[in-house]
Amino acid sequence: MTIEIQDILILIKEYLLNIFAFDPNSPLLFTHFRFWAFFAVVFTGFSIVAGSLHKNRSGARLHLPGWRRVLRNGYLFLISLLFYYKTSGLFVGLLILVTLTDFFLARGIYRFRQKAINKGHEKSKMALFLLCLSVTIDLGILCYFKYSYFFADIVNQIFGTNFQVTNIAARLGNHIIGRPFWSVDRIVLPVGISFYTFQVISYTADVYKGLVRPVRNILDFGFYVSFFPQLVAGPIIKASDFIPQLYRRYALSRTQFGIAVFWILNGLTKKIVMSDYLAVNFIDRVFANPQLFSGFENLAALFAYSFQVYADFSGYTDIAIGLSLMMGFYLPQNFNSPYKAQNARNFWKRWHISLSRWLQTYLYIPLGGNRNISFGTWFWICVITIAALILSGSWIVAVIVLAIALATVITALRSPGKRRHIYANMNSMITMLLGGLWHGASCNFMIWGGLNGVGMIIFKFWSDWHTVKRIIVTSYVVCILFLLRLWASPALALWNVLLCFCAFILVSMIIKCIWQYYNSQRDYVRWPRFAKATNVVWSVIVTFTFITFTRLFFRSGSNLDPAVANETAWNIATSMMTRIGTEWTVNPLDVIPAYWKVFLLFCIGMAIHWIPERMKRRYRYLFAKLPLPLMVLVCAFAIFIIYQFVTAEMQPFIYFQL
């Protein structure tokens, strides 16, 4: 009997050790059964902790008493730390360090700001110093772990050195504990560091601006920073949106519960059925060896990847929104059907909305926004010039980039009427370049961000032009590309792709001009709804195609060893562009039957994506209103279908390593 009890105790001990053990090969992902077992236990504990915290029936008290709030938020803070430890190991210490640092610095910022206001001053130098210290610490941590190899590559390229990156933090840790516990020859990127550093920067900045009061309790602030559903891949939550929720009572209606379940199922479907299946069965094969596939297959893989990255990232966000809602917290919308966008500018109002707003609030506007340029603008122009030098390996290109920037500023100074537009475009371009670099430490990400910036600027000019002017300008571009195509060069494939794209736009503009002339000769506009719908469809197709080709640089720069990311990413991108622009010997009709499931799934996914938003809201509400037994049956059927698509090896979320 004693032996049996000992065996049981040993099993319990091993089980508990396994729960709190970190396995780098098995992080807690939303698509793993282990996570849902983890969440079931967490939600059970949360229900016990928050069960007595419901709003009373009269609704008189919406806020929690202090000790109950601390109990609930402290519980979720500790659970979030456990989740991050299971996902990223001892990097949980880094998360705690950032939390403690910004908690105390924000309190200091608020204290000195209030003293300045009481003395009749608008600003406090000490508060500004603490803000700069907070931003320096947060960005310093981010740059060390994410951009060390990138910066080392720049230094080596410019000065011809052979500087090697070593893990200083690991070396220091080994020295403290007195033994070689951590590897010092490689810097590992902590999961989600790009998200939570930006989140705490926005918090201290908003405290400095007086937009929010600092959180008084470290457990409340820690919960805000580390809330596990959105910790590793966003959305980036503004303090003013989330902190007030920390003090509210837990309340979850029957309809809200149904909506939460719908978001979770919707996210799992996007991730497993759409994203992972397309990646494993087609996209990854082509991107791994683009030279083995035809131009059509490379092009199809590029369009499929454009949908995959949306399904992957928005799928994570949907699950995060659903999990948060079940616990009574609301996360902001991060995607609004981005491939319905009719131009690049509108796309970025629909895609990764939380990041777009962060960049606008904390980068674009401080640079001067649409009014002026600042010292920061000139600083980043110099940085971009250096980046151009690294990309091309030629001083001539760097000089050209700098000359263009100077010519743009001189033009703005000599043309007061256009000055604000020019400054706005400069600041917008810098914002997009840095937004691209936020996604990854590779020049390809900067190219991706720069292309999006160019697309936004071109649209601003395009929207001001008459149809005839659009035709004339596009005709010039087509002629130039045609002449470049006749000149044999390594960029022949690029000229071919651009020529096809611009020729499509030109033909479309000519048809539109003829249609407008035809209707101008009549007393009424014929088929106005058809004309409007056609124009919308055309704009969506052009925008989707443009965004898809920028993804070439996004995909080729992802999931690479930081030490060789620049060279590898560039080789993948150029190889795919070469195949797309020149290799069309294989008949597309012979390719489609071989991958018919992939093409069918892509078409179904895009069709669902393009469903009008009012219809999506309607079927979400209908699902939420289903009787509970019927909802359980629908969920069971959906889960059964979803896990028919599960691959042997689960695919990590694309944004998991940002």
Enumerate the language-model features and the residues they cover.
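Membrane-embedded transmembrane alpha-helical bundles that form the catalytic cores
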Residues: T2-Q657
